[in-house]
Amino acid sequence: MSTRRDLPQSPYLAAVAGRKPSRVPVWFMRQAGRSLPEYRALRRQHSMLAACFEPEVACEVTMQPIRRYHVDAAILFSDIVVPLRAAGVDLDIVADVGPVIAAPVRTVADVDAIKPIDSQSIAPVLDAVELLVAELGDTPLIGFAGAPFTLASYLVEGGPSRHHARTKAMMLAEPATWHALMTKLTDLTIEFLLGQIRAGVDAIQVFDSWAGMLSLADYRQYALPHSARVFATLAEHGVPMTHFGVGTAELLGAMSEAVKPGTAKVVGVDWRTALADAAARVQPGTALQGNLDPVVLLAGWPAVERAARAVVDDGRRAVDAGAAGYVFNLGHGVLPQTDPGVLTDLVSLVHSL
């Protein structure tokens, strides 16, 4: 049973559901994290993974950008590899590298060794959600997970990869092993997101960070069916669902197909694709989210203001072209060197437009 709140005044929830919001809603991927001095102070006492499994710490980090920026949505502080850790995978998040897997998954036996997760193994994450639901007031909470393809890539490569060569080799040369791995990861992702929904998140986002490395044909064959099963299983719970990847211009239409009609669905767009162009690629009834280049935030306020105004105008053109709604965001996560004051001013600007 969901403990989800009724938030009829939320601009974010209105936009993603295809209703007219009271203002352009804005939040930022990685709004909670390395750009905030209060986060860096807290991290001196906790590793990244430890923070994800400490409910009070995860709650505090999630709340920090809400207090500072007054964004229209909170996103749970976590990491896409958290459910892998809960499933018994030996991994760490290494500074300036990312997730590193101690024993990469290369064989059927490796796939078989991945354990399922349950509410007990992710209890600290769900406890953090419940703390946040009690503290956020009228601000909606977005839960999230990594898409099966992106999780598989980390497991097979052993960490971040430029070419994803081992991942693609398994896909193409050992499709049975590949789909067995993807089936396990799909089950894991579903359980992780269902737990968050039952604990009270108001929306979810699935990050397919590495999907842009695939051709459209390979994406449709090796990744989309598994992501679609995640969304199909969650659809009955009625939460808005966002599908996001980087470098996915040619995949946007297929990504929008993962969420079936009748559900509030959003596709995230990176800075390489105009929002109005994205509106022509996605399925009818799809809202869009994006897509300011995060690097623009390092270029000084005149450049930020100029670019942000252009993005909001593009978002409005996208709605005129058929997008169900529009949410302002970056095209990827906030960079660590970003001045928090710029983000505060950016939120105020977007709200004024």
From Swiss-Prot:
Entry's Gene3D superfamilies?
A: 3.20.20.210
Pfam families, alphabetically? URO-D
The source's domain of life comes to Bacteria
One GO term of the cellular component aspect? cytosol
Query: Which reactions are catalysed by this chain?
Result: uroporphyrinogen III + 4 H(+) = coproporphyrinogen III + 4 CO2
Protein name stated in the entry: Uroporphyrinogen decarboxylase
Quaternary structure annotation from Swiss-Prot or TrEMBL: Homodimer.
Q: Which GO terms describe its biological process?
A: protoporphyrinogen IX biosynthetic process
Family membership noted in the UniProt record:
Belongs to the uroporphyrinogen decarboxylase family.
Q: What does this protein do?
A: Catalyzes the decarboxylation of four acetate groups of uroporphyrinogen-III to yield coproporphyrinogen-III.
Note the InterPro entries from the entry: UROD/MetE-like_sf, Uroporphyrinogen_deCO2ase_HemE, Uroporphyrinogen_deCOase
Which PANTHER family is this protein grouped with? METHYLTETRAHYDROFOLATE:HOMOCYSTEINE METHYLTRANSFERASE RELATED (PTHR21091), UROPORPHYRINOGEN DECARBOXYLASE (PTHR21091:SF169)
The UniProt gene name for this protein comes to hemE
Q: Give the EC number(s) listed in the UniProt record.
A: 4.1.1.37
What Gene Ontology terms describe what this protein does at the molecular function level? uroporphyrinogen decarboxylase activity
Which residues make up the annotated site Transition state stabilizer? D79
